[in-house]
Amino acid sequence: DFSVYVPTFHTMEKRDYLDVMILDFNKMVEELGSIETLKTDFVSNVSHEMKTPLSIIKNYAELLQRDALSEEQRREYGEAIENTATRLSDLISNILKLNKLENQKIQPEAEVYDVCRQLCDCILQYESAWEKKEIEMEVEMEDRAEIYADQDLMELVWNNLLSNAVKFTELGGVITVRQLSDEQGVTISVSDTGCGMSKNTMKHIFDKFYQGDTSHSKEGNGLGMAMVKRVLELMDGEIQVLSEEKQGSTFIVTLPMAGKEFGQL
């Protein structure tokens, strides 16, 4: 029971060594209670996130067993099952990745590389997605900018930011990717003209499983931005978000220049 509280024997002015030990004990119990609450919330969130796609798969599987279904219906139900199974697989994969990141089981393998080239490669991966929504993709960056980071982990960052931008930008909108360098480091921003975020959503956007309002809950599991935050912490980088409801969002990433090695875990 983490609600146990042991009172001290003396007032603040007359506290002795035993009182200090009691205060330390109470603080430890409070911290353990917080950890237990986080664990409980995590299990609850995972259960909820897995239950929803499993229910969808079950419902469509039952529909497929009906007689006299047209070929179009069978194809539609099959695609729905496949898409939902992919979401479930992504959820499990993200949970495992985030767990490894938070428990330091993934050690960054940093090297000096051209982040501009990496950004261009990541952007091109979403070409069919933005063209399908008739989104205008604007890119402003230098010919080359070197950073010292783990390429694979940084690719995870860019893919999350770009996929979110495409996902939340409406038909005919605009996505802008900017990069610039100065003496402090490299700054990359990803802006969109999508639905934007409320102040409360902005406050919690990097929390695990947080999806904000209904406009930010579609096709997601609330883990991507938590991973982005953790990866950038490992790289001694930072991320901030600027957004207004119905006015779009901008995510700004800052990274140290090549030659400035990040701190060891």
Predicted region positions:
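Short alpha-helical segment of the dimerization/phosphotransfer core of two-component systems
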Residues: 83-88
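Membrane-proximal coiled-coil signaling linkers
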Residues: 15, 32-70, 76-77
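Short conserved segment of the HATPase_c
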Residues: 197-209, 229
